[in-house]
């Protein structure tokens, strides 16, 4: 089993979970800043947004998780703030981040569609990296299986949980997001391929489809009224993404990326 603590500095410790999250965020910021000039967005605007949105999105992701696990946290309120032990929901962070992005864009007189377009690839690769934090924390896994001979030993050993091997759903989602990142980075600058806003739409459809399938394999899903919340949200993302693509394709006045 991999030690979830990467570095100890006296009474303080730095966990692999935090390293994965922060590494993904830094890469996302780099990619957004590199693309920002194409959309006439200042690098300072990117940094200002990240400094505001990153901590608030983490809080939003935690609140989302706690709400759907209230039966546990109502009895252990002290653990609500123990975010270093894991327990954040990506959808909570995405919803919070999207709301903040729209508000920030209007305040800075930035087209929010452009901002979403430059942010989407970075978010996708950040999610791919962040899932490895779940791996080290032994969370976001699937049902028990007899063996995991198709994965490297270090993954197989870490996925031995509660006396059984578990489907490495974290790995599936990480690879799915990485593949989506490669695709969108390969086509977004091709002439007359994507219209303004369609990079973000691609993210909605791609991530929504993958998450819907992978969520069905997990055993730690958040439920509401007996239904997997993330699957419902995935369906909503896919519908929004497809509707927006159809609309943007029909409107001649919308420019290409």
UniProtKB/Swiss-Prot annotation:
The keyword Cell membrane applies. This is Phosphatidylglycerol--prolipoprotein diacylglyceryl transferase. It is found in: Cell membrane. One of its GO terms (molecular function) is phosphatidylglycerol-prolipoprotein diacylglyceryl transferase activity. Keywords: Cell membrane, Membrane, Transferase, Transmembrane, Transmembrane helix. Its EC number is 2.5.1.145. It comes from Streptococcus agalactiae serotype V (strain ATCC BAA-611 / 2603 V/R). InterPro entries: Lgt (IPR001640). GO terms for cellular component: plasma membrane. It comes from the Bacteria. A 1,2-diacyl-sn-glycero-3-phospho-(1'-sn-glycerol) binds at residue 131. Pfam families: LGT.
């Amino acid at each position: 089993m991999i030690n979830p603590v990467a570095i100890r500095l006296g009474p303080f410790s730095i966990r692999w979970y935090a390293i994965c999250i922060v590494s993904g965020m830094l890469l996302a910021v780099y990619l957004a800043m590199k693309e920002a000039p194409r959309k006439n967005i200042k690098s300072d605007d990117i940094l200002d947004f990240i400094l505001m949105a990153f901590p608030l999105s983490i809080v939003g992701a935690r609140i989302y998780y706690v709400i759907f696990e209230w039966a546990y946290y109502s009895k252990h309120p002290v653990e609500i703030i123990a975010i270093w032990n894991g327990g954040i929901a990506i959808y909570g962070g995405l919803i919070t981040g999207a709301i903040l992005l729209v508000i920030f864009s209007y305040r800075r007189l930035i087209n929010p569609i452009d901002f979403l377009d430059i942010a989407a690839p970075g978010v996708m690769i950040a999610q791919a990296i962040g899932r490895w934090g779940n791996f080290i924390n032994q969370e976001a896994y699937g049902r028990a299986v007899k063996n995991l001979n198709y994965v490297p030993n270090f993954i197989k050993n870490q996925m031995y949980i509660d006396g059984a091997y578990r489907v490495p759903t974290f790995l599936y989602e990480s690879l799915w997001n990485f593949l989506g990142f490669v695709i969108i980075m390969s086509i977004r600058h091709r002439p007359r391929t994507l219209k303004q806003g369609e990079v973000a739409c691609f993210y909605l459809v791609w991530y929504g489809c993958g998450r819907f399938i992978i969520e069905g394999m997990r055993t730690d899903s958040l439920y509401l009224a007996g239904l997997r919340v993330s699957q419902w949200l995935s369906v909503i993302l896919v519908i929004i993404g497809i509707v927006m693509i159809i609309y943007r394709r029909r409107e001649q006045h919308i420019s290409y990326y």
